[in-house]
């Protein structure tokens, strides 16, 4: 069989290369060989018929929880990678809040070995900022980088010590690593379980004020100014955080940000509308309509650089409890494109900006070799049917997690083929619609 693959007749949208039009993508030896309007295909070459579909660089997710090692009952590297390619993601960054925490080469190497064995999405480990993510002592950043980590995070836990955060930014700068941080002041969070506002009052649930996020973002931007370190703000959810990041960028500081599909599409009112469903419990919590508008505008104008899923699978035991006691987080790899395509249809995003925020935008944040269909680039490609409608059935998801707020929803937009390094690693089963 020929080692050449042709993706024919699709609308190629590649913001990194400035391409948007019907083209044929030619893949040879795992690399993009050509993107052209007219190419003659040899008789023995393989082909994907992409007519009436989008062809984009494979999506890049800066924020996923693969749970391995230590929590394989929730997810494994293999099942998470399978969910990723089903959603069009060819590269994912694995957060370090595993058991044990990824604060050393041994854990990083295990994650990479599991990813290689799965042979699906590319997995880029993120190492811990502090040993055990306990916020007391810095991890060995040189060791983490040498073993394959692309960024550092204590995700799920904020770095409460300003002194430690300062040292982390300085130390990480020496190794060229960004810090991707979970921003919340635990003293303001207290025992809150949802956004502090009228909805929380009506529901009788303890609230988390927006300022819990805002003050930490402002603190860390000040520390970036002091140290010159690179800061990436994870799962931005408030208008105040957006304003702070926008101003930091205006001043030329090395600050970037991401936003999740659920913080773009849902509000705190959805908690009550769902009947206290724990599939609507996450951290940061779903915010107000004003916050959602601010996040949408920030993504559209480039203040926020990337869409990231914060894919967080949990077992039924951890979710099928009262709202206060339930684990935070939802799965998102397989629904992200569909949910965000809804924003395009509402006029909140352009098609080009959507693709950019899922491809070259995140790739640039962590300096990953991804997000483009330029000649010579790795042939990581998503073929997408923007018109296909499907019903979200948790039992049909590839992730072990079933915790999705989109359960039973009819969504539009489906990944039909995912290609990694020139290999077709996912083809849609239309029965899943």
From Swiss-Prot:
Intrachain S-S bonds: none
Enzyme Commission code(s) on record: 3.5.2.3
GO molecular function, one term: dihydroorotase activity
Amino-acid positions noted as binding Zn(2+) 2 in the UniProt annotation, renumbered to this chain: 155, 182, 235
GO cellular component: cytoplasm
Transmembrane segments: none
Cofactor(s) named in the record: Zn(2+)
Residue positions binding substrate: 65-67, 97, 283, 314
Cofactor note as given: Binds 2 Zn(2+) ions per subunit.
Residues at the active site: 310
Domain of life: Bacteria
Enzymatic reactions: (S)-dihydroorotate + H2O = N-carbamoyl-L-aspartate + H(+)
Keywords: Hydrolase, Metal-binding, Pyrimidine biosynthesis, Zinc
InterPro entries (UniProt xref): Amidohydro-rel (IPR006680), DHOase (IPR004722), DHOase/Allantoinase_Hydrolase (IPR050138), Dihydroorotase_CS (IPR002195), Metal-dep_hydrolase_composite (IPR011059), Metal_Hydrolase (IPR032466)
Biological process, per Gene Ontology: 'de novo' UMP biosynthetic process; purine nucleobase catabolic process
Biological pathway: Pyrimidine metabolism; UMP biosynthesis via de novo pathway; (S)-dihydroorotate from bicarbonate: step 3/3
Family: Belongs to the metallo-dependent hydrolases superfamily. DHOase family. Class I DHOase subfamily.
Function: Catalyzes the reversible cyclization of carbamoyl aspartate to dihydroorotate.
Protein name: Dihydroorotase
Highest classification ranks of the organism: Bacteria, Pseudomonadati, Myxococcota, Myxococcia, Myxococcales
Gene behind this protein: pyrC
């Amino acid at each position: 069989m020929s080692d050449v693959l042709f993706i024919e007749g699709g609308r190629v949208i590649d913001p990194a290369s400035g391409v948007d039009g019907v083209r044929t993508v030619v893949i040879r030896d795992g690399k993009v060989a050509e993107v052209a309007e007219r190419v003659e295909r040899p008789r023995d070459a393989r082909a994907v018929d992409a007519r009436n579909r989008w062809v984009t660089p494979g999506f890049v997710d800066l924020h996923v929880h693969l749970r391995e090692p230590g929590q394989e009952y929730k997810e494994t590297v293999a099942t998470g990678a399978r969910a990723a390619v089903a959603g069009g993601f060819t590269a994912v960054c694995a957060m370090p809040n595993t058991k044990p925490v990824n604060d050393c080469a041994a854990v990083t190497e295990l994650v990479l070995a599991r990813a290689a064995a799965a042979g699906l999405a590319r997995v880029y480990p993120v190492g811990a900022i502090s040993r055990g993510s306990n916020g007391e002592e810095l991890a060995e950043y040189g060791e983490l980088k040498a073993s394959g980590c692309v960024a550092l995070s204590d995700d799920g836990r904020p770095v409460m010590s300003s002194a430690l955060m300062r040292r982390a930014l300085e130390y990480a700068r020496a190794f060229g690593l960004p810090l991707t941080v979970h921003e919340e002041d635990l003293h303001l969070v207290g025992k809150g379980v949802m956004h502090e506002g009228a909805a929380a009052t009506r529901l009788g649930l303890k609230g988390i004020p927006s300022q819990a996020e805002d003050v930490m973002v402002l603190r860390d931007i000040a520390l970036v100014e002091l140290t010159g370190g690179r800061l990436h703000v994870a799962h931005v959810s408030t208008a105040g955080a957006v304003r702070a990041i926008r101003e930091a960028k205006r001043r030329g500081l090395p600050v970037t940000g991401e936003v999740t599909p659920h913080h773009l599409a849902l509000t705190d009112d959805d908690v009550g509308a769902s009947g206290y469903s724990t599939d609507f419990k996450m951290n940061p919590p779903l915010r107000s309509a004003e916050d959602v508008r601010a996040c949408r505008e920030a993504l559209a104008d480039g203040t926020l650089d990337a869409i990231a899923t914060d894919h967080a699978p949990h077992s039924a035991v951890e979710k099928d409890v009262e709202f206060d006691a339930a684990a935070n987080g939802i799965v998102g790899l397989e629904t992200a494109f569909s949910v965000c395509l809804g924003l395009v249809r509402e006029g909140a995003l352009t098609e080009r900006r959507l693709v950019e925020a899922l491809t070259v935008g995140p790739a640039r944040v962590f300096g990953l070799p991804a997000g483009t269909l330029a000649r010579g680039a790795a042939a990581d490609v998503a073929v997408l049917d923007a018109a296909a409608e499907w019903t979200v059935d948790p039992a049909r998801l590839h992730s072990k997690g079933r915790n999705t707020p989109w359960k039973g929803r009819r969504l539009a937009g489906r990944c039909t083929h995912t290609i990694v390094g020139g290999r077709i690693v996912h083809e849609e089963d239309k029965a899943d619609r």
